[in-house]
A protein has these predicted regions:
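N-terminal entrance/gating region of PLP-dependent enzymes' catalytic architecture
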Residues: 1-83
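Glycine- and acidic
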Residues: 48-57, 81-87, 140-146, 172-179, ...
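Catalytic cores of large soluble enzymes that bind and process phosphate-bearing ligands
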Residues: 53-64, 91, 122, 150-153, ...
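Buried hydrophobic packing segments
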Residues: 65-72, 95-104, 130, 290-294
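Conserved PLP-enzyme active-site core in the AAT-like
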Residues: 90-262
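Active-site C-terminal subdomain of aminotransferase-like
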Residues: 219-222, 226-323, 328-330
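Conserved PLP-binding catalytic core of the aspartate aminotransferase-like
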Residues: 324-346
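Single conserved hydrophobic/aromatic residue that forms the stacking wall/gate
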Residues: 347-358
Length: 358
């Protein structure tokens, strides 16, 4: 249903088909390669296709993106159908920044909060995209200490951190809870944050960074409540270019209805509909890739893949146990982090020149 910019007559669209002197749209192999064919067609998925209208020239691939978001929001993360907004972002870093941007503006608009009254609250193991968001959005970032062995947030240290922040004028908190940190695969308990903040009578919004664990944890821990069935969870991000093995960069931002409009850019007047995203123009080919992967596997096929990964991880951990090599691993994740004291430096590369350390 997309406009064919190679053969159709069209004017006035924010679109650009790939140069046909370099990228051949009639190459025979494209018939059996939907993602590559879409890549050449280059649909512009500018805007948010779960909220209001969008550029009508790309309604076909926009519908595929909406279906991908529905599968992730409803089937993966237990959201009620039609009660979510979101988009396929150029990566998890942008998706996390988008989440914090939405919450900052929510507090600005609904509480008349000043930026110096808002703080980001996250663990020491949180991804570096969060300090980026702190810098870009002019918000202070508070690092909650974690236990060295368990990687769990220290409740007492967290309480002291929040009390000090309140005494320094902080009134509103943007909480980032990790669904598998990049370095450890550790999973935060969101209740550690929310119980404390509610007990202190503080306003907050809770975001789940599932960039790594989003395609693993819902299938490896079927009893998990780190999803939209928990009314305290307002948004979730996932990276499809990690465990789903979609092309770089393919992140996903999901949130509850009533939030994303806080970042409406009214100045984007030439765009049909409303631009509620950080990136603006983005390729629709990523949506096709994610759709193909999800529907090729299906829920049972994906569950099987994750189960095999966990079996291999369990096997690897047993070998480490036999060798008395200490490590950290969340039982529901496929990341194993070894203690540096038990790694032979001879076989690790030096960060400076990539040569083996001696």
């Amino acid at each position: 249903e997309n406009v064919d910019f190679e053969n159709d007559t069209s004017l006035g669209y924010p679109a650009s088909k790939l140069d046909d002197k370099v990228f051949y749209s009639d190459a025979p192999f494209l018939k059996d390669a939907p993602t590559l064919k879409t890549y050449v067609a280059n649909p512009n998925h500018i805007g948010c296709h779960t909220f209001g209208s969008s550029e009508s020239a790309f309604k076909g691939t926009q519908e595929i993106e909406r279906e991908v978001l529905r599968v992730l929001a409803v089937d993966f993360f237990k959201m009620e159908d039609e009660q979510f907004d979101g988009y396929i972002a150029p990566g998890g870093t942008e998706a996390n920044i988008q989440a914090i941007w939405v919450f900052r503006n929510y507090f600005n608009h609904h509480f008349d909060a000043k930026n110096n009254e808002i703080a980001i609250l996250a663990s020491d193991d949180t991804h570096y995209s969060i300090p980026k968001a702190s810098n870009l959005l002019s918000l202070d970032l508070l690092h909650a200490p974690v236990d060295f062995k368990t990687r769990e947030i220290d409740p007492k240290a967290l309480e002291n951190l929040v009390q000090k922040a309140v005494s320094n004028g902080k009134k509103y908190f943007i909480v980032i809870a990790n669904m598998a940190t990049t370095m450890f695969g550790s999973v935060d308990d969101p209740d550690v944050y929310t119980d404390l903040l509610e007990g202190m009578g503080l306003d907050y919004k809770l975001h789940i960074d599932g960039a790594y664990g989003g395609f693993v944890y819902p299938f490896s821990n079927l009893k998990s409540k780190i999803n939209f069935s928990n009314p305290k969870v307002s948004s979730i991000t996932i990276d499809a270019h990690k465990m789903l093995q979609a092309p770089y960069g393919t992140g996903v931002y999901l949130c509850r209805k009533g939030l994303i409009e806080n970042v409406l850019t009214k100045e984007a007047e030439y765009v049909e509909g409303m631009d509620l995203t950080l990136c603006g123009s983005r390729s629709g080919a990523n949506a096709i890739a994610v759709y193909m992967i999800l529907f090729t596997y299906g829920p049972y096929g994906w569950y099987e893949k994750i189960s095999v990964l966990l079996m291999r991880t369990n096997w690897f951990c047993k070998q480490l146990d036999q060798l008395s090599i200490p490590y950290f691993r969340n039982e529901h994740m496929n990341i194993v982090t070894l203690y540096s004291s038990h790694i032979c430096l001879l076989y690790t590369s030096d960060a400076a020149d990539d040569r083996p350390r001696v």
